[in-house]
Amino acid sequence: VRKFAGTEIAQNLIHEILFYCEVDFKFFTQAVEALGDSIPDCGMKAMIFDAYDKLKAKQLTGQAPDFELPNVKGQKIRLADFRGKHVLLDFWASWCAPCRKKNKELNLQYPELRDAGLEVISVSLDSKKTLWLQALKEDRVEWIQLIDETGFEQSKVREAYKVEQVPTVYLIGPDGNILLKNPEIEEIHEIVKQERA
């Protein structure tokens, strides 16, 4: 996109990958910035910027909304209890195949993340506790697991975090502010390392 900034070619490239852009807002932002201000006015330009503005309005920024949900033992856990630490907040569900895959990937990264001082908290949007517990048993996850049994559609926590699909992950700073949405593992390590330096 940068190579063809200011041309209709760049617009066509973004149009072709618009679906991916809507999944990854950070990438969408970089692509729109790469277009520059010198894009010829046309219907496609308007469509791209309209899609960008709508997606931008859905982004969560500032303080992470606090919540309290039960863990596997039924104990209520509050997000605010982890203030002072980096938190990787993961929204998922047992019926979500990409979420289950992410669990397996995170299993490999978790020891290193934990040793770096980062807490991982997963919030299941399952409406049936038994399915959630079975998935945890199968995936053998070791980090903090919470459930919102109201389910995906009714979850107030999901709404507060503007989660439209799972998996959705937020990196939250020690001050409780949202740092990144759907970060890559490398980005997480880099931010934690920078802030601890």
What are these regions (language model features)?
Residues 89, 121-123, 146, 170:
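Conserved hydrophobic packing residues within short motifs/helices of P-loop NTPase cores
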Residues 84-86, 116-118, 140-143, 174:
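Loop/turn elements at helix/coil->beta-strand transitions in domains of secreted/extracellular proteins
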Residues 101-139, 150-159:
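Structural microenvironment flanking redox-active thiols in thiol-disulfide oxidoreductases
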Residues 86-87, 167:
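Alpha/beta-hydrolase fold active-site loops
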Residues 83-84, 91-108:
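Conserved redox-active cysteine motifs that mediate thiol-disulfide chemistry
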Residues 141, 150-193:
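Thiol/disulfide oxidoreductase modules built on the thioredoxin-like
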Residues 1-77:
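Oxidative protein folding and maturation machinery
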